[in-house]
């Protein structure tokens, strides 16, 4: 499946656990990886439920940072990706709710 961020087409590939695409640069294993060069997000196909959604959101956050040329240290990038993956839905849901109330004149 594919999606577009800032005009760049990305794809998501579900791969077997332990797949070489799930290796970090330091050689350690992961359950998700965002490859800017290939414009591909690789996710361990054994994931499911809320954890799968959080890993997907985390990796899409990396894709957005690459697509918008947002440069951070590794630690900063991971912090932002983790925050959005864990709490982004709640933040956007609240913002949407407040925005709708303001538009209707309830403020």
Give, region by region, the residue ranges found by the protein language model.
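Metalloprotease/metallohydrolase-associated module, dominated by Zn2+-dependent proteases
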Residues: 1-51, 67-107
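Active-site recognition of the HExxH zinc-binding catalytic motif
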Residues: 54-66
């Amino acid at each position: 499946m594919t999606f577009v961020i800032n005009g760049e087409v990305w794809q998501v590939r579900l791969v077997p656990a332990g797949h070489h695409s799930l290796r970090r640069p330091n050689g350690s294993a992961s359950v998700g990886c965002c490859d800017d060069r290939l414009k591909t997000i690789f996710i361990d196909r054994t994931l499911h439920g809320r954890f799968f959604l959080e890993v997907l959101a985390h990796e899409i956050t990396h894709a957005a940072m690459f697509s918008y040329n947002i440069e951070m240290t590794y630690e900063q990038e991971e912090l932002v990706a983790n925050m959005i993956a864990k709490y982004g839905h709640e933040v956007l849901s609240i913002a949407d709710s407040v925005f709708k109330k303001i538009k209707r004149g309830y403020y």
